[in-house]
Each structure stands twice: as C-alpha cells, then as structure tokens.
Amino acid sequence: LIHLYVACNPLKVMAEAKQYSNISSPLVAPIKLLSDQVRKKLNKVKILNFGVGLQDSSFKFYNSCSNIPKLYTVAYALSIAASGKANKIYLAGFDGYQKNDRRLKIIDEIFQSYSKAKGAPSVTAITPSNYNIQKKSIYTL
C-alpha cells in the first residue's frame, strides 16, 4: 500500500496547514496553487507536487499533472491514481452523504465523469457506500 495525504483546494490546505505539519507521510498537492504563506507553514512537510487544471466535466491524465472537472480532493486523488497507472482503485470509508444531500450528486457526477475517462482504472467500494459506484465485499477480494 502507498501511504499519502492528498489535498488540492488551496483554501482547505491553508485551513488545515497545522494538521499537515504533524503528518509523517508525504502530502501530494499542486504546489503552484499554494501561496508562499501556506508553503512556509508546510516547510517541514514532504510535499510531492502533482499539478492540476480544471476542465469542464472530464478528466485527462498526464505523468505529472491532470485535468479534473471540479477542485475536489476525490477527483484529484482519482487522477493521481490514474496518472500513476493504477490497475484498480478500492475505496474504503467512502460511505457518502444522505440521499437528499446535493453533495452526493456532485460526487456521483465526479465518479461518472471519471469512469468515462480514457485510462481510468475501475473504482470499487469495499465498504458500504451511497455513491453510485461498483460495490464489493472486502471478504470477496
């Protein structure tokens, strides 16, 4: 298993900078989106730069960057896995939001767009999930 922290939204990184300063695993983030102030706060954190661009409703994967439809960590993390040539992606703890929560629809749209992208490995939830993705019991793997 690879142990990484992933963050792409500069405002969230700024808000969570103190927590990141205590992590022992690398943080993958688009360095160009981080302000100098945030970078200074993260000076003791090993940051792996993976660039990101926004592109309407689609994903594109490259060696050191990707285009994603929304600046959501799940989209960024999926694009990192695809760019790294992962064969499969298993999700645990992605239980999702309640059926009437608009965020459920947004994340479902991200998963739908991702599944259509060229070079996207399959995504399977191995714990219960409200998202519209393939599900499989962890005990059947």
Predicted regions and their residues:
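Metal-ion/cofactor- or nucleotide/acyl-coenzyme-handling active-site neighborhoods
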Residues: 1-141
